Amino acid sequence: MLLTTGRKEKLSVSKGSEIEISSQEYEYGSGNVWYCVILEENLAKSKRKKLSVRHLDPLLKYDYSPPLIKTTVHRFMRPVPPPDPFPEVDFEEGDVVDAAYKGGWCSGSVVKVLGNRRFLVYLRFQPDVIELLRKDLRPHFVWKDEEWFRCEKQQLIESDFSAGKSVEVRTKVDKLGDVWAPAMVIKEDEDGTMLVKLKTLKEEEVNCTKISVSYSEIRPSPLPIGLRDYKLMENVDALVESGWCPGVVSKVLAGKRYAVDLGPNRESKEFSRLQLRPSIEWKDGIWHRKEKVSGSEESSHAVEETAASTRIRITVRTALKEKKALGTGINVRTTRSSSGAMHNPLPASFNGGDVAEAGRVSVTVNETPLFETAALSGELGNSLADVVMNESAPVTSQPEIAAPKEFHPSVVLGVAAAVKTQGKTTPKKKLQAMKNQKSSTNDSVGEKVSVNKRKRGQPRKFIVAEPKQKIGVSGNNSKAATIEHADMTDDDRPLASWVHTGNSSSGQSVSRTPDIGLNTVVEKHVDIVETPPGRESTMVLPFVKKSQLWKVLESMEVFKVVPQSPHFSPLLESEEECREGDAIGRMVMFSSLLEKVNNLQVDDPISSINRIDECFLKLEKHGFNVTTPRSRIAKILSIKERQTCALEELKAVEEKITENDNKRRKYEEDIVELQRQEVLMKEAKVTLDNEIARMQSQAAVLDQEVQNVDHEFQAILAAPWK
């Protein structure tokens, strides 16, 4: 639809006039190309049908070389359109414009505003989409019946494949197969295909190829993503010379570089992170991400560990001297199946209870609680046997209370057995004494031991039979291996009595049971279970657990999920009657703090989170393991700091948006005011034109009267005297 401008203009066809001509006859409002020319001859004097013209550059107004047009006919001419009334105002999407392109003014429409006074323009003549600056554009005017009209703004239809949209086209490349090349949509052809223009990836190449493709060979451009790391066997698209080629990451190299297998031939090439993106598929109008490569290809890169059956050979020998009965030498031989485990037996020899040399095992019996145990039954009866993990270092005794051991899963399996001895025992009685140990009431270390039978194919396990035991490891890293025993009566004694009287409540020697000696070799298949690190069953506390609340606390889900073994040593400074109550309060406090952490909200103040962290610090002094909750609190505080910064930036951006919006509204008001003034000025101009025309007519009459008077005057002077 055409909109009138109220301006009329006649075509001047005299020599030297600047006009615009078309290369073909045009229809009003249709797309065409108009060239700026200078007439080289007058239309009235020329007896030829065609007129000679001189082609001008559409912007610079000098001769265009080489000229694209030299002659024209009258019906292809029109005056030069009126100048742009608002050259400082940017065009909007859908505006019909003329673009200075290839020596002429090509009509088209704006399909996208790029910013910084840059626009994507769809050209109707020789269909194309090009990027142009504001200075290379002008409003599209139509000259009809000696009057200028403007075209109404077009309504653009937005879609994934509308003109000017960035897309990717599937092309075939030798050795690489399918490659997705970047392109831009121009228009939809009548046969249902899409006319697109391939984008070049080389800066030196300017001309872009136009091709028609079907909808199955085209897809929108994926959204850009930030820099990220890629994993082994991950599906990616790699940027090659002709586009994005699908591939699989085969190697992760140093310096954020990757080796990628491309195409059906699996050609391997190296790429940086900037040249890769996750591989995604356009299907049914939705992006689908390809899954990681699995199967035989991935299994070659994975490492899988399987448990092997273990055969343990144990040799137990008694001490020869009564005064050194605290140590018992044990020879341990560990063998494994063909899974690649060690087959080295530990050399062991023992003399008179002395600590063995490197590779030997010695065991000490103490009256302190134990932390981790595993037991053996059968010919050994109820005698204790602890399985420890060591890397070719000896297991040595440790007096008094031993420090908890660290759990190391990748070490050699060894066995240590704890036996209370007193006096000497002949070798003939060793095995019998071992069998009769079940009925001994004086032996405080009578433990239930069982060896589970397992079905074929099941993993081997160690059965944990008694919680009041502790295993430590001593090797090159000074880790001690200690097996200790505690009487039931000593567990309930306060820590103060231990400090004054020592580890034994009776003040007697540690060794209180009859001497039990063994000098035999027992071979058993034992199932192995790795005891979780940090497992503790009994702790020497500064008070006696008398309240029934302890069972309730220990049965709570929170202490099953996050096991705790606090020592409550700071309570020694409190009154003895208040210690148990204070300890229960701290257990409840730990549970409530974990619940508070779980119930934290994103809008909670940082001060309240810091107070929770300070409470955990106080509980840590009492032996609570607060590493996990404090780590979570640290992450939450970090997120809160980021949230605070983001909120401040958001506030600043919103203020800037409000400020710019106010400016935009002011500009709109100014534009409306200018348009109103334009209408008023046009009306005033029309009034002045009419007034000028009236006055010109009056002036003509007066001029004629003046001429008549002059003629009369001359006639009177020229009249004869006769």
Swiss-Prot record:
Biased composition, class Polar residues, residue ranges: 434-444
Domain of life: Eukaryota
InterPro entries in UniProt: Agenet-like_dom (IPR008395), Agenet_dom_plant (IPR014002), DUF724 (IPR007930)
Tissue specificity statement from the Swiss-Prot or TrEMBL entry: Expressed in roots, leaves, stems and flowers.
Location in or out of the cell: Nucleus
Annotated Gene Ontology cellular component terms: nucleus
CDD domains per the UniProt record, alphabetical: Tudor_Agenet_AtDUF_rpt2_4 (cd20406)
GO molecular function: protein homodimerization activity
GO biological process: flower development
Boundaries of every DUF724 domain copy: 540-720
Keyword terms, alphabetized: Coiled coil, Flowering, Growth regulation, Nucleus, Transport
Region listing for Disordered, in residue ranges: 424-449
Residue stretches in coiled coil: 645-712
Further facts: Plants with reduced expression of DUF7 show a slight delay in flowering.
Assembly: Homodimer. Interacts wtih ABAP1, ARIA and LHP1. Interacts with the non-modified histones H1, H2B, H3 and H4.
Known role: May act as a link between DNA replication, transcription and chromatin remodeling during flower development. May participate in the repression of LHP1-targeted genes during flower development by direct interaction with LHP1. May be involved in the polar growth of plant cells via transportation of RNAs.
PANTHER family: AGENET DOMAIN-CONTAINING PROTEIN-RELATED, DUF724 DOMAIN-CONTAINING PROTEIN 7
Protein's name according to its UniProt entry: DUF724 domain-containing protein 7
Organism: Arabidopsis thaliana (Mouse-ear cress)
Organismal lineage: Eukaryota, Viridiplantae, Streptophyta, Embryophyta, Tracheophyta
